[in-house]
Structure formats: C-alpha cells, structure tokens
Amino acid sequence: MTNSHGEKRCTRYKLQKTVRERGISPVSRAIQEFEEGQMVHIDIDPSVQKGMPNPKFQGSTGKVIGQRGRSYVLEVRSGNAMKEVFSLPQHLKPQKY
C-alpha cells in the first residue's frame, strides 16, 4: 500500500492535545482580535478543523498583514522565502515581549 499524501500526514503527535487540554477550547481563543503588524505564534488547536493552517507551520511566528473574513493573513518565513498563511484566531497566540 502506498503512503498517503494528504495535508495531515505525519501529524500523529503534532496534532494531539495533552490529557489536561482535552475537550472544547475556550471561547476567548475564538473571539480574540489582532491588529495589523502584530506578531503572533501559530499554535494549532486540533479540536478546531476549520481555518487550520498547514501543520508544517506549527510553532512558527509571523506578522499579521491583513484579515479575510474571520481569518487572518500572516506573513511567515519558511526557509528563505516569505509565505502567506491563512488562519482562524483559534490557532493563533499573541507574542509576548
């Protein structure tokens, strides 16, 4: 049988919550707002499948450059290239200085 090439391949542990984090995520993560130019961390919430960025961006940091509907457009460095990543606020955390 050939290996799958889906978007969620190789994410067995990456998209897994710890025992204490199980269940529905708090509403405050869904209604948080970010401003343009603000730095945010991508922290994927596996209990919310909609608006999930590609798992290869898990743990990376980017700058908010805009908004499309309810989701945010982020500028993230991937190697030497700058990529645009779309994500719902459930999968983002503000960077603390």
Swiss-Prot record:
This is Large ribosomal subunit protein eL21. Pfam families: Ribosomal_L21e (PF01157). The keyword Coiled coil does not apply. The keyword Lipid biosynthesis does not apply. GO terms for cellular component: cytosolic large ribosomal subunit. Belongs to the eukaryotic ribosomal protein eL21 family. GO terms for molecular function: structural constituent of ribosome. It comes from Methanosarcina acetivorans (strain ATCC 35395 / DSM 2834 / JCM 12185 / C2A). It comes from the Archaea. Keywords: Ribonucleoprotein, Ribosomal protein. One of its GO terms (biological process) is translation. PROSITE patterns: RIBOSOMAL_L21E (PS01171). HAMAP family: Ribosomal_eL21.
